[in-house]
Amino acid sequence: MEQAPEDQGPQREPHNEWTLELLEELKREAVRHFPRPWLHGLGQHIYETYGDTWAGVEAIIRILQQLLFIHFRIGCQHSRIGIIQQRRARRNGASRS
């Protein structure tokens, strides 16, 4: 006979609330690294494409995550995880001038 699952602790936040909190965190971080007019244009593009829908929220989250990842990967001056340009140039044996 089937039984109800045991209580597994406190219930997690609703998915929608978590998604909106993630979007706010990404927006705060993006403003630190990219020009506001550029981010505004991105937001306008998403709104014109998706309207005021969850698909639009998911799209802008995905785009901001990708942009920030690439930005950090190529060596953001605010980041401790980025590649430092001089090291990369030496490692490849190339010099930039």
Swiss-Prot record:
One Pfam family this sequence matches: VPR
InterPro entries from the UniProt entry: RetroV_VpR/X
Region (Homooligomerization): 1-42
Keywords per UniProt: Activator, AIDS, Apoptosis, Cell cycle, Host G2/M cell cycle arrest by virus, Host nucleus, Host-virus interaction, Ion channel, Ion transport, Modulation of host cell cycle by virus, Phosphoprotein, Transcription, Transcription regulation, Transport, Viral penetration into host nucleus, Virion, Virus entry into host cell
A biological-process GO annotation: symbiont-mediated arrest of host cell cycle during G2/M transition
One annotated Gene Ontology cellular component of this protein: host cell nucleus
Subcellular localization: Virion; Host nucleus; Host extracellular space
Family to which the UniProt record says this protein belongs: Belongs to the HIV-1 VPR protein family.
Misc remark: HIV-1 lineages are divided in three main groups, M (for Major), O (for Outlier), and N (for New, or Non-M, Non-O). The vast majority of strains found worldwide belong to the group M. Group O seems to be endemic to and largely confined to Cameroon and neighboring countries in West Central Africa, where these viruses represent a small minority of HIV-1 strains. The group N is represented by a limited number of isolates from Cameroonian persons. The group M is further subdivided in 9 clades or subtypes (A to D, F to H, J and K).
Subunit structure: Homooligomer, may form homodimer. Interacts with p6-gag region of the Pr55 Gag precursor protein through a (Leu-X-X)4 motif near the C-terminus of the P6gag protein. Interacts with host UNG. May interact with host RAD23A/HHR23A. Interacts with host VPRBP/DCAF1, leading to hijack the CUL4A-RBX1-DDB1-DCAF1/VPRBP complex, mediating ubiquitination of host proteins such as TERT and ZGPAT and arrest of the cell cycle in G2 phase.
Function: During virus replication, may deplete host UNG protein, and incude G2-M cell cycle arrest. Acts by targeting specific host proteins for degradation by the 26S proteasome, through association with the cellular CUL4A-DDB1 E3 ligase complex by direct interaction with host VPRPB/DCAF-1. Cell cycle arrest reportedly occurs within hours of infection and is not blocked by antiviral agents, suggesting that it is initiated by the VPR carried into the virion. Additionally, VPR induces apoptosis in a cell cycle dependent manner suggesting that these two effects are mechanistically linked. During virus entry, plays a role in the transport of the viral pre-integration (PIC) complex to the host nucleus. This function is crucial for viral infection of non-dividing macrophages. May act directly at the nuclear pore complex, by binding nucleoporins phenylalanine-glycine (FG)-repeat regions.
The protein's name in its UniProt record: Protein Vpr
